[in-house]
């Protein structure tokens, strides 16, 4: 099996036309890596194009009436038959002294760069594998200037150059790749981890890598563990995770918010702000939780007593207000699975007709359905 054999015919035809213009095509990045790992073809295909300028390719797409998007560094993106294609001109990235951000380089683009030159900018050897295609001959050649194929077989994450330690985002990618693919971190990286400067690490890149890991909770645990053991300096906003522990079940931002809330209630607002959630999100969670705990503590005798009273005799909604709040914020229900004496199923099938509503005091009307549910569930 080859990568070329996995490419559908309509995409092969397009690539042949691009080759006929004079371009050389090389699949790079995640596609070769994932192919060598599990023999699958991604729907996100990145190509380095050589021999001609990117403007020639864009003119081709324009003439073919194929929509494309121009991105920085002469990258051209095309959505073609379900495939997300990116065509980029090979480039060298020269470090900017003193810049600690992810964009710490100046780019030099050239369609004649060697693979060794253009692949040097990548992070790990396993991400510096290319597959040069010849669609006319339906053949391919593996390009591996840094030994990435062997490192994949050995399941090792190894850096390409010293530049690896200049980019704080690569610290995050190290965590993500080691967890996602169950890879060992090479001794050459482990011995130099303390060289990373995370003082200008951005929330944007942290959240992006965290979510890509598919196990955000474990990602945060590992980040905390490494930062603490290496005594790395991090921006103050990342310290909200200190003292919090998550599980593999914490897979979404809401999962992390709830888990944080249950561990340290005061951390919920900070976590919500970290993820740029509406302020109301953390407030609704706390409101639901408070109502849930009130209902949880109510005895059967109290419920029977309340059900036997006419709603017209009640001066305060009391427990009914808490039930209504649970209904209004039921999206949080999945996180609180302890059984209650009265719950959602009790009032879901209860209907209130217009006569009943009109005969109920105005301030109690919105609670009538919940009172009827109690009467139905706790008949004397």
Where are these predicted regions, by residue range?
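Catalytic cores of the polymerase beta-like nucleotidyltransferase superfamily
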Residues: 1-380
């Amino acid at each position: 099996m080859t990568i070329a054999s996995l490419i559908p015919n309509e995409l092969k035809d397009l690539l042949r036309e691009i080759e006929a213009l004079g371009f050389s095509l090389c699949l790079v990045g995640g596609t070769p890596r994932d192919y060598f790992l599990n023999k699958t073809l991604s729907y996100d295909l990145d190509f380095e194009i050589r021999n001609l300028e990117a403007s020639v390719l864009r003119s081709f797409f324009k003439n073919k009436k194929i929509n494309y998007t121009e991105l920085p560094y002469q990258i051209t993106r095309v959505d073609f038959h379900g495939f997300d294609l990116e065509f980029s001109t090979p480039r060298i990235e020269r470090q900017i002294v003193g810049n600690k951000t992810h964009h710490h380089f100046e780019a030099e683009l050239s369609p004649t760069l060697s693979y060794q030159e253009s692949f040097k900018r990548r992070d790990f050897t396993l991400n510096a594998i290319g597959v040069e295609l010849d669609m006319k001959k339906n053949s391919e050649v593996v390009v591996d200037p840094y030994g990435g194929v062997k490192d994949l077989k050995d399941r090792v994450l190894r850096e390409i150059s010293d530049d690896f330690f200049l980019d704080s985002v690569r610290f995050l990618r190290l965590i993500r790749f080691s967890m996602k693919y169950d890879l060992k971190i090479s001794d050459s990286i482990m011995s130099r981890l303390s060289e990373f400067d995370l003082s200008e690490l951005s929330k944007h890149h942290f959240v992006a890598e965290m979510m890509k890991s598919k196990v955000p909770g474990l990602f945060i645990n590992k980040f905390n563990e490494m930062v603490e053991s290496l005594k790395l300096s991090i921006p103050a906003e990342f310290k909200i995770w200190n003292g919090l522990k998550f599980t593999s079940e914490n897979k979404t931002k809401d999962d992390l918010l709830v888990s944080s809330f249950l561990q340290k209630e005061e951390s919920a607002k900070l976590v919500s702000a970290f993820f740029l959630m509406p302020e109301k999100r953390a407030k609704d969670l706390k409101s639901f939780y408070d109502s849930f705990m009130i209902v949880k503590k109510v005895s059967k005798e109290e419920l029977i007593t309340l059900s036997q009273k006419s709603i017209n005799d009640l001066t305060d909604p009391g427990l009914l207000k808490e039930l209504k709040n649970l209904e209004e914020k039921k999206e949080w229900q999945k996180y609180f699975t302890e059984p209650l004496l009265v719950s959602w199923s009790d009032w879901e099938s209860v209907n209130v007709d217009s006569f009943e509503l009109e005969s109920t005091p105005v301030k109690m009307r919105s609670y009538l359905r919940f009172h009827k549910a109690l009467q139905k569930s706790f008949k004397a």
